[in-house]
Amino acid sequence: MTEAAVQQPAVLVERRDDVLVITINRPEARNCVNGAVSIGVGDALEQAQLDADVRAVVITGAGDKSFCAGADLKAIS
């Protein structure tokens, strides 16, 4: 299996003590939101809501170009 064939998850979730860090992981598309991102962020927020030990949630974007470009217009069309 080649590196290109390995699909990365659209959203990464990491626990840092009492903080849940949600990373939108689509830097090649400026982290724009498609169906997988929407579901992944929603699931992570639900996870945080159900965990009494989570005191804060941080949402960030992968890469160094942008946080999130908005909706993925290519996925919508």
Task: Give names to the regions the model predicted.
Residues 1-64:
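Conserved CoA-thioester-binding segment of acyl-CoA-metabolizing enzymes
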Residues 42, 76-77:
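Residue-level signature of transmembrane alpha-helix interfaces in integral membrane proteins
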Residues 67:
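Short Cys/His-rich "knuckle" micro-motifs
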Residues 70-75:
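Short, flexible, mixed-charge acidic loops at enzyme active sites
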